[in-house]
Amino acid sequence: MSRLFFVLISLMGTTSFAAEVADLCQSHTAISSQNEVERQRTTATILQQVLVKVVGKQSALAKKDLSGLLEQADQFVTHYAHERDPVCANQQLRLTFNEKALNQVLSAMGLLSWHKSRPESLIWLVFSNGNSQRILGAEDQGSTAYQVVKQAARQRGLPVFLPLMDLQDQHQLRFTQSALTMDEDSPFVQPSRRYGADIIILASVVTHQQDVSITWQWLKEGELQRYQSEGELSSALSEGVNMLADALAGEFTVVDTK
């Protein structure tokens, strides 16, 4: 289990949204068969996944009794499909829920919904090992590390992407090894401007034998947040993305019953 520490430094900030998440009320999970009993059994599990995406903040859901809603989960299903996992070929069930009905129920429960238009985040994922350093770019989208980040972000309805790391980026970041900090003077700020992202994230990964320590820093038009996750790589990356999603959801949630 990775450990996570969080410190907030508020400098200034304004609200802006860049990307609309299209599948907020859709999710999937592995199943053992395609019969009706199996589908009904897993519906509540998939609805829980959707609620995390829609509400955004895990702590807000934890404070509510969702048992009644989950018991009626099947009533909110608008579409279902049986699929094969493209990686391991396991069967999975994908469900789509009624967005308007869910938002109305959540609003009645006093839960705020995170709007489907969400800040788009550029993530500089930097791996340091001794004197060597590597920054993941667009050509590394198939890497295990980025796939973990992308999957965790997808589960939270958070739009993220990698920089190109082309010659332009490489030239501007040639002196970053001794400057892994995120502030207005950071060498990562200038090359980030070309991407037009709402959030600039710097995730510095340092390997310690079997585990890693990841320092997360991000800026949103002057607002800086810094936290750290430690543990096995996949776990530490997922924890960092979850903390980012919780922080953003806490700032941008609105009641949306349309």
Where are these regions (language model features)?
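Sec-dependent signal peptide recognition
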Residues: 2-8
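N-terminal signal peptide c-region/cleavage motif recognized by signal peptidases
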Residues: 13-16
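Amphipathic beta-strand/beta-sheet edge segments enriched in Tyr/Trp
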Residues: 22-30, 99, 191-242
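N-terminal Sec/ER secretory leader and immediately downstream segment
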Residues: 25-82, 87-91
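C-terminal/domain-edge helix-coil "capping" segments
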Residues: 41-56, 94-97, 106-116, 153-161, ...
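N-terminal segment of the mature soluble domain
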Residues: 43-65, 119, 123-131, 135-181
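Signal peptide-directed extracytoplasmic domains
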Residues: 64-124, 139
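A short, hydrophobic beta-strand-centered structural micro-motif
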Residues: 75-83, 123, 180-213
